[in-house]
Amino acid sequence: MSSPALLDVFTSTGALLNGHFKLTSGLHSNTYFQCAKVLQHPEHLAEICRHIADHFKKNNIDTVISPAIGGIVVGTEVGRQLGVKTIFAERKDGAMSLRRGFSIEPGEKILVIEDVITTGGSVAEVIEIVKSYGGEIVGVGTVVDRSNGKVTLADNQYSLLSLEVRSYEPADCPLCKDNIPLESPGSRASKNN
């Protein structure tokens, strides 16, 4: 799937939003990718995840792990297409952890999957969890990389759509200075209120 084709899918499903948004990272932006609006359609989910799975299929992956909540749907479908176990990390008391009986064995080959990367903070936390269990990171896959490749989390990193979308520190946000109402559409409260 080409970048223009994926952008068309985001646009046609109402998943590419323009306005003034507070991102999970605490940064502000005039563009928001609401992946859930694309991924709710099984045909889009399957096609998007097929491209990600195809990129990593020769890496002998044992397990796919995703950060909750945005990465769970993508991670589960990529894992299904690769025929491997899928798990997720979730926040407890503000920190990512494995719960629900999930575990990682030493030497287990792990692929980290996320829907959207801006700063890479959640994925970096998941990578640290994997390493703390002795797992081996074989790659990171995402649907959208808002940093246009500036955020590098693994040697083998793949994003279906990689583009630079402006993000601002709240104190430097021109949208705030123009008094444009701020929306917080993310899956959890942002880090910087």
From Swiss-Prot:
The organism of origin for this protein: Prosthecochloris aestuarii (strain DSM 271 / SK 413)
One Pfam family from the record: Pribosyltran
Binding-site residues, orotate: T118, R146
EC number: 2.4.2.10
CDD domains: PRTases_typeI (cd06223)
Gene name as annotated: pyrE
Function: Catalyzes the transfer of a ribosyl phosphate group from 5-phosphoribose 1-diphosphate to orotate, leading to the formation of orotidine monophosphate (OMP).
Listed cofactors: Mg(2+)
Family: Belongs to the purine/pyrimidine phosphoribosyltransferase family. PyrE subfamily.
Binding site for 5-phospho-alpha-D-ribose 1-diphosphate: E114, D115, V116, I117, T118, T119, G120, G121, S122
Catalytic activity: orotidine 5'-phosphate + diphosphate = orotate + 5-phospho-alpha-D-ribose 1-diphosphate
Name listed for the protein in its UniProt record: Orotate phosphoribosyltransferase
GO molecular function: magnesium ion binding; orotate phosphoribosyltransferase activity
